[in-house]
């Protein structure tokens, strides 16, 4: 451009450049705008989805509280079950749905439908990548399996848990399952392991369980 001597030459050069590059420039800008607005639309959709899932989850929490009460009606139990299913069906890729499935499993346990409870817990385990969520679901699955009379498999299931923040809870649960299965010595060892690592506030209950074993002369 510096070699050009007149404005007309500069204008003509710009025209020629535009003819050669204008269409690709417009296309590039259009694509860039589409990406920007598409990203914003996606973010907005994600926000709305999270808000709706959160609202449904809060409704589920309230419904489960009512459905779990001793005086709960069949309608209240049905409402809670419907909300849990809707949360999973409509927002299955959210954490709210996984928490909802945990509630659903609890409702099935209350009804004595252990197979359905296991299905809900297995769904949580399949959907979640979070180690804490997986640990919670696995511990609940172990309880359900023990209630079905399969304590040995339940304990084996617990052996695979490695989440450090749940080590005390897992050891205590093992003690409960061993005790229910009549393996008193193993129950005592599990309780002692839990008590050794437990925070101060959790020790009284563990000590009570150990004292109970001692009182039985075991």
Task: State the predicted function of each range.
Residues 88-97, 125-134, 161-169, 196-204:
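Short solvent-exposed coil/turn linkers within tandem alpha-helical repeat scaffolds
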Residues 1-31:
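N-terminal positive-inside, membrane-proximal cytosolic segments immediately preceding the first
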